[in-house]
Amino acid sequence: MTPNPSENKLKSGPSEESSGSGDDQQATGSGEEYDDEEIDVSLDDFDSVNSYLDSLNSALDAIEQRNDDLKEQLLNLLQSNREIRQSMQEENAKRSADGGGPSEPAPEAASEDAMEH
């Protein structure tokens, strides 16, 4: 059963705004206006809302855990990409410093060219 907030407002006692005194006893109501059946229904509604909030809390915890796992994976991927980029830049800088021109083909590529001719 899904709790209906409008029903809870109807069942609640006089509000602090309407009492104007701010006295806690008047704001919450004395309970004399309600019979036992309405109080039991209110407790059942409270238990229902409490159960619903517990299930929402569990779902949010699971989502938060997945979010944390994804964040960790993304940070690892980012770090890996930074390392790869840095090594490629160092390799390109080394090639430029050594030859100044286009790099020589890899030995495997050179042997394949020789086999074709």
UniProtKB/Swiss-Prot annotation:
Signal peptide: none annotated. Residues 50-92 form a coiled coil. Keywords: Coiled coil. Residues 12-22 have a biased composition (Low complexity). Residues 1-39, 83-117 are annotated as: Disordered. InterPro entries: BBLN_eukaryota. PANTHER family: BUBLIN COILED-COIL PROTEIN (PTHR34344:SF1), UPF0184 PROTEIN C9ORF16 (PTHR34344). Belongs to the UPF0184 (EST00098) family. This is UPF0184 protein AAEL002161.
